Amino acid sequence: MNKTIAVAGLGYVGLSMATLLAQNNHVLAVDVSKERVDAVNNRRSPIRDEYIEKFFAERTLDLHATTDARTAYESADFVVIAVPTNYDPKKNFFDTSAVNSVIETVLQVGSQAQMIIKSTIPVGFVAAAREEIGRAHV
């Protein structure tokens, strides 16, 4: 049974996940960059990757990109979070603000989607997020 999957982030990880999942599911790819969104919707890869380009050209994909995160998350069964978490070696710190923002938006729209984090996060992040939001769907 096909699922509706929202993928947050159209970088290498997010675009790869969205492309593969779109073979058998309805995928809504979310990004803040209108250029990336337009490229995906026109079946052009916004990143240079031989396999993604090949899939775009040769495969039937149920893949649509948008900058409207709220609408995408609202209808999703799953939300794959693949947004940047830059590491600052001087502070020994991962900037998880983009991950937190996606989680907050999913909760704000009332989605019951299972959230899957593919971004690099520090040890204990998921447990802390579950405790903070009172929900095990992360």
What are these regions (language model features)?
Residues V40, F56, A129-R130:
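Hydrophobic packing residues within well-ordered alpha-helices of enzyme cores
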Residues I47-R48:
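N-terminal FAD cofactor-binding segment of flavoenzymes
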Residues S75, I81-V83, K118-S119:
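Short, well-ordered coil/turn residues at beta-beta hairpins
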Residues E74-F78, G110-A113:
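Short acidic/histidine-rich motifs immediately flanking catalytic phosphotransfer sites
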Residues I52-D77:
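A structured beta-alpha segment of the ubiquitous adenosine-cofactor-binding alpha/beta core
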Residues Y87-H137:
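Rossmann-like NAD(P)(H) cofactor-binding subdomain of soluble oxidoreductases
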Residues A6, L28, H64, Q114-I116:
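A structural signal for isolated positions on well-ordered beta-strands in alpha/beta enzyme cores
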Residues M1-R44:
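NAD(P)+-binding Rossmann beta1-loop-alpha1 motif at the extreme N-terminus of oxidoreductases
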